[in-house]
């Protein structure tokens, strides 16, 4: 939300402020944590950013009004500087981006919903830090739901109360995925990498769509981002590759090293509409043409 790097001491102080906040709301992990329920409560039981700002402001004033020795003053001054910096960031979130981050969720229990959509049309126009923070929230929400649902389904499957075809699965579908999953967004790449590695254990899957592979590696992307992006493609079992610009051949060879032959890469810029290569990890590559029926063409609202 602030751009740049965050120092370790800022993270430690931020965590301490969060502990104070949750303690005020009755979530004290030091006392009776085994008996008290922390999860599964109504959304209104948990604090918002406005609550955090109020708590931070109040605690700063309490620290300022205290009496300290000269030695203690040095520590207190440093603490106040850190807390004031954090409070300013929280205030900016509440005042400027409160519409997106400050408030209670409209989905009280995501497990009760069959289909959930996220509209990114407004978010994509905001500065990168805000967009990325929203995306991380969405990924985390979907991943948490996948794990929760997957454990329940596995338990019922093991008990024999349901059959495999009765298992409720989790599928994440992202169109224009290059907007938030590219070589410059390291944290998002790491989260999706974890999802790709572990989601299958919880009956989860993901589909990523984009028009140009070059959009996944925008100009200025570093080697770390490229390698993490390559890892995403390696972990993806099925890849449908349609026609790409000839300028993308070098990137295709790098991303699909060991999966696509040079001859197949050379074919990609010359493919006709509908033709593609299906690359199956650990198996083979299949070249075929996607057939679009008249009924499908009527409801299709994209481009050619």
Task: Say what each PLM segment does.
Residues 1-204, 278-282:
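P-loop NTPase motor domains
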Residues 1-4, 184-291:
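Conserved ATP-driven motor cores of ASCE-family P-loop NTPases powering translocation/secretion/packaging/pilus
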Residues 104-105, 114, 272, 294-296:
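Solvent-exposed, flexible loop/coil residues
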Residues 134-137, 256-257, 293-295:
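Short, solvent-exposed amphipathic alpha-helical segments in soluble enzyme
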Residues 292-304:
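C-terminal alpha-helical "lid" subdomain
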């Amino acid at each position: 939300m602030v751009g740049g790097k965050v120092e370790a001491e800022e993270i430690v102080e931020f965590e301490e402020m969060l502990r104070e906040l949750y303690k005020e709301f009755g979530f004290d992990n030091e006392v009776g944590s085994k008996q008290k329920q922390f999860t599964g409560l109504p959304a209104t039981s948990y604090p918002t950013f406005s609550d955090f700002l109020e708590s931070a402001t109040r605690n700063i004033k309490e620290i300022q009004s205290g009496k300290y020795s000269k030695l203690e003053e040095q520590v207190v001054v440093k603490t106040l500087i850190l807390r004031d910096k954090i409070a300013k960031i929280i205030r900016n979130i509440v005042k400027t981006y409160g519409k997106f981050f400050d408030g209670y969720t409209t989905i009280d229990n995501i497990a009760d919903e069959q289909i959930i959509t996220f509209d990114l049309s407004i978010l994509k126009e905001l500065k990168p830090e805000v967009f990325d923070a929203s995306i991380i929230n969405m990924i985390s929400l979907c991943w948490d739901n996948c794990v929760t649902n997957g454990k329940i389904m596995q338990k019922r499957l093991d008990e024999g109360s349901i059959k495999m075809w009765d298992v409720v699965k989790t599928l994440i579908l992202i169109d224009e995925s290059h907007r938030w999953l590219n070589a410059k967004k390291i944290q998002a790449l790491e989260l999706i990498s974890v999802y790709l590695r572990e989601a299958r254990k919880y009956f989860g899957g993901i589909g990523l769509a984009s028009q140009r592979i070059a959009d996944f590696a925008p100009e200025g992307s570093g080697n770390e981002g490229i390698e993490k992006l390559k890892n995403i493609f390696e972990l993806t079992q099925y890849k449908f590759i349609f026609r790409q610009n000839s300028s993308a051949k070098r990137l295709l060879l790098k991303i699909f090293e060991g999966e696509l032959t040079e001859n197949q890469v050379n074919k990609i810029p010359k493919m006709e509409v509908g033709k593609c290569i299906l690359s199956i990890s650990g198996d083979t590559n299949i070249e075929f043409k996607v057939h679009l029926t008249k009924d499908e063409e009527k409801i299709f609202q994209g481009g050619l």
